[in-house]
Swiss-Prot record:
Ni(2+) binds at H81, H92, H94, C100. One of its GO terms (molecular function) is DNA binding. Its cofactor is Ni(2+). This is Putative nickel-responsive regulator 1. GO terms for biological process: regulation of DNA-templated transcription; response to nickel cation. InterPro entries: Acetolactate_synth/TF_NikR_C (IPR027271), ACT-like_dom_sf (IPR045865), Arc_rbn_hlx_hlx (IPR013321), CopG (IPR002145), CopG/NikR_regulator (IPR050192), Ni_resp_reg_NikR (IPR022988), Ribbon_hlx_hlx (IPR010985), TF_NikR_Ni-bd_C (IPR014864). It comes from the Archaea.
Length: 140
């Protein structure tokens, strides 16, 4: 059974598109469409993994954001305070005059950890976000 292909249009910053084109060239994709389909499949797989996080977990959320984006730093701080019962530590690094890198160390319920991660990753100005967790007992 052949799947119908849908044509879509997207807007990307030229630097991001340039990096993507370089990667798909190195990986040997026949077209941008092949690379984008693979990236979307990877994104869907990651989303499904995040939805399946259960039980007690330890982990980290690493993210890069534009601290000059109006209200973003305050929103990130408010979110972290709301989930302070999960947060054990955080590291904040100023990458340059515009971007910050932060790593938040977590310990608690997996569903809440995933919720915290998703709440932060969708904010406009968060450029990268990666949640990593492992199952653990509560004695950590």
């Amino acid at each position: 059974m052949e799947t119908e292909l849908m044509r879509i249009g997207i807007s990307l910053p030229d630097i991001l598109l340039g990096e993507f084109d370089e990667i798909i060239g190195k990986r040997g994709y026949s077209s941008r469409s092949e690379g984008i389909r693979d990236a979307i499949r990877s994104y869907i797989s990651y989303y499904e993994w995040m939805n399946d996080i259960k039980g007690h977990r330890v982990g980290t959320i690493a993210f890069v954001y534009d601290h000059t984006k109006r209200g973003l730093s305050n929103s990130l701080t408010d979110i972290q305070h709301h989930y302070s019962h999960l947060i054990k530590s955080s590291i904040h690094v100023h990458l340059d005059h515009k971007e910050c890198f932060e790593v938040v160390v977590l310990n608690g319920d997996g569903k809440e950890i995933a919720e915290l991660s998703e709440t932060m990753m969708v904010l406009k100005g968060v450029k990268f976000s990666k949640l990593t967790t492992v199952a653990s007992n509560e004695n950590i």
